[in-house]
Amino acid sequence: PVLVWRNATRIRLIAAFRAAHDAPETALLTGEPLICDGIELPVKHRKKRIDLEARGLIKGAQCIYLGPGKKPGFSRLFVMGAADPLVNAASIIQIELPDSEEPMIVSAAKMGAAFLHGAAVTTHKAQGSQWPSVQVFGPDLQIAAKMGRVEAGIPLWKRLAYVAITRAEERLYWVTRYALARPKEPLGVGDLDMTPAKLELTAEDPEA
């Protein structure tokens, strides 16, 4: 993803990413990245919440959209890093649009896992997450530096830069200007391991 400071920048970059891949306005393409924004379930559905969280759908989880589910409002997802990554879940997926107060609702389950688009993420939302490769949007940090804001005795731009840099596990790209190269290949899921997890039966401990 591209890590940014300002939400307006995030929305613009997501729109540019989708336009570069010729994504339709009202639907997601297979392979589009998503970030789980939490589970929206009433208290009485506590067991379902625990089940979704056990499958890896926790706030900040990185997912890949595989397509619509069999039921209305459901989506098939690949949860990155999960032991059993193939999940079919009731989902609320919204994509904010430039110059629009109302987001586009791609999947509108009444309740379930909520998602935001994962092509660009604010440094605030990115805290606690890590990716093999991360892009940092330099112009946003430059604006933060010019504002001269200080938080807890540390210049804001330094705090933002630290969070952004430490999100990268292997590689960091520093973006210096508003430009987006055309993708060399279409979005896809060919690099994901789609093998379903093996079912394992374990005997109960009689002394437990």
Regions found by a protein language model. Name each.
Residues 76-207:
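C-terminal accessory regions
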Residues 1-76, 125:
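Conserved helicase/translocase motor-coupling segment
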